[in-house]
Structures are given as structure tokens and as C-alpha cells.
């Protein structure tokens, strides 16, 4: 308890400093843009998504289920964002892109890549018992005002294959360790399609910290609403390591515009302190 209080006071002290340095990161499952969702179709939700991004103002955010025309819309209607990522079907534009967006006003992209969650990670492929091809996109980013470097990884685990979820996340965990010999701070976001008590999260919990659990100001709401107001399953996550603390974790349940939902997943975001 004493250690927790000291840690809490340290984060609060950092936040009270006028030269506070940190990263606001978001995970947002946009919902597949070609789905027949009626009143919840992308064309009716896309403006609300832009309003949400303008309101929250993440330094970087990872999206899931994004198709190229959804990415293009976000780029065209927001300021100062660029993105990296490839389509999972061909390594170019086809299929879901595990895109990472970053603000050019606060961050500089130094390197990036995408790999497939499969036995052949360098090529478009489906792994184990997965229903779909799954990928992870990683970036090495520089925080301009502080000069600090950090890695950011974004992924989407399979919704059907239990083995694919376990092995896919295991691959991500191994890569997180091997890709970072300089021990830079690290962020992982994604739709993991598992609840917090799922055993497949145990290897990740050993090397990284859940922002939901660690935040000074946290949020108990679930993230997957399935177009229902009274529903909220926790299947979307933000993990971190190498940061001094997490000041905030929030599930974005506010309405933006006239649409009932901006997606079948509520966006989640965290404020991480260097």
C-alpha cells in the first residue's frame, strides 16, 4: 500500500508540473465499413468519428477493422494526422488495415512495419485456427517536445480461433521484447476479443501494465457495446511499459452528433507519463 501511495503521489506531482510530458493514446475499432448496419452504417457515423477525434485529441491512435476508404476519410477530415499500415489481405490496400495514426504536430515517425499473426509473419497469411488474416503494425515514434522515443504496436486478435488468439498474442509479446534492445517505452493497443480474465493475457501481463488497471483516474465501463446502450464488454485494451505512470484511462461513451453510436466499440484512451 505504501508503494502504491508513493507511486500515486509521483504521478500527481508530474501532472501538476507545467512542463508535463506525456502521450495520449487511443484504441478505436471503427467497425468494418462495408457492413450492412442500417442506421449504424459508416456513412452515417463517420462525421461523429471525426468530431470525437477532434474532441479527445490523441497524439496517436490505433484503429481496427479499418478499410482504405475509412482511413482516407479520417485523414481528409482531421488536421495534422498521418498514418502507417497495410491491408491484411495483400500487404497493400486490400482488407482490414491495422493502421496507426500519429499527430505530426507532436510526434515524428522514425520507423514502422507490419507482420502477420501466423507461422509465416512476413507474408499475407492466416495463422492456426483463425477465421481471418490478422496483423500487427508497429511504429517507432519520437515525442517532439521531450525528444523521447517510444514504440507503439496495434493489433486485432481473431474473433473465432482460440489457438490463434493465444499464439497471435504470444507472437506480439515476443516481438515486443526482441524489437526493443534499447528498452524504450512501449505501448500496445488493440481489440483482443477476450475478457480480462482470459489466460491468454497472462504472458502480456507479465511484461506490460494494463492502463485500465494502473490509471490514477480510471473507468470501469466496457468497450464493446454491440449497438446496445446497456452493454459493455471489456475486450479492447491499452498496455504500456517504460512510462513513469498512467494518469487517465477513459472509455468514450459520449455522443457526437445525432447518431446513437460512433461504432459497435467505444473508443478507449489513456494519458501516459514519461
Feature locations, PLM:
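Bacterial Sec-dependent N-terminal signal peptides
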Residues: 1-22
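N-terminal, active-site-proximal structural segment of metallo-dependent hydrolase catalytic domains
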Residues: 15-77, 90-95, 274
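Active-site-proximal beta-strand elements of phosphoester/diester hydrolases
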Residues: 22-34, 98, 110-115, 148-158
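Short, Asp-centered acidic motifs that coordinate Mg2+ and/or phosphate
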Residues: 23, 59-60, 150, 185-187, ...
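Catalytic metal-binding/acid-base residues of hydrolase active sites
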Residues: 31, 67, 156-158, 192-195, ...
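Structured beta-strand-rich core segments of catalytic domains in phosphoester-bond hydrolases
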Residues: 60-149, 245-252
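Metal-dependent phosphoester-hydrolase catalytic domains
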Residues: 140, 163, 167, 174-186, ...
Amino acid at each position: 500500500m505504501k508503494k502504491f501511495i508513493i507511486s500515486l503521489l509521483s504521478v500527481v506531482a508530474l501532472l501538476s508540473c507545467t512542463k508535463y510530458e506525456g502521450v495520449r493514446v487511443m484504441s478505436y475499432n471503427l467497425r468494418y465499413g462495408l457492413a450492412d448496419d442500417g442506421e449504424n452504417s459508416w456513412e452515417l457515423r463517420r462525421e461523429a468519428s471525426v468530431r470525437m477525434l477532434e474532441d479527445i485529441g490523441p497524439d496517436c491512435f490505433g484503429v481496427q477493422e479499418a478499410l482504405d476508404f475509412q482511413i482516407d476519410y479520417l485523414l481528409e477530415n482531421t488536421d495534422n494526422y498521418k498514418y502507417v499500415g497495410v491491408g491484411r489481405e495483400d500487404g497493400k490496400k486490400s482488407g482490414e488495415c491495422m493502421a496507426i495514426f500519429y499527430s505530426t504536430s507532436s510526434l515524428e515517425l522514425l520507423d514502422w512495419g507490419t507482420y502477420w499473426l501466423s507461422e509465416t509473419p512476413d507474408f499475407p497469411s492466416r495463422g492456426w485456427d483463425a477465421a481471418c488474416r490478422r496483423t500487427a503494425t508497429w511504429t517507432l515514434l519520437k515525442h517532439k517536445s521531450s525528444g523521447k522515443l517510444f514504440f507503439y504496436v496495434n493489433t486485432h486478435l481473431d474473433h473465432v480461433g482460440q489457438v490463434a488468439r493465444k499464439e497471435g498474442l504470444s507472437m506480439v509479446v515476443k516481438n515486443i521484447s526482441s524489437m526493443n534492445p534499447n528498452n524504450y517505452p512501449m505501448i500496445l493497443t488493440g481489440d483482443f476479443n477476450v475478457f480480462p480474465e482470459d489466460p491468454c493475457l497472462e504472458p502480456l501481463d507479465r511484461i506490460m501494465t494494463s492502463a485500465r488497471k494502473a490509471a490514477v483516474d480510471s473507468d470501469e465501463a466496457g468497450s464493446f457495446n454491440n449497438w446496445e446502450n446497456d452493454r459493455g464488454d471489456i475486450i479492447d485494451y491499452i498496455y504500456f511499459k517504460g512510462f513513469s505512470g498512467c494518469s487517465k484511462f477513459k472509455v468514450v461513451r459520449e455522443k457526437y452528433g445525432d447518431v446513437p453510436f460512433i461504432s459497435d466499440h467505444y473508443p478507449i484512451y489513456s494519458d501516459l507519463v514519461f
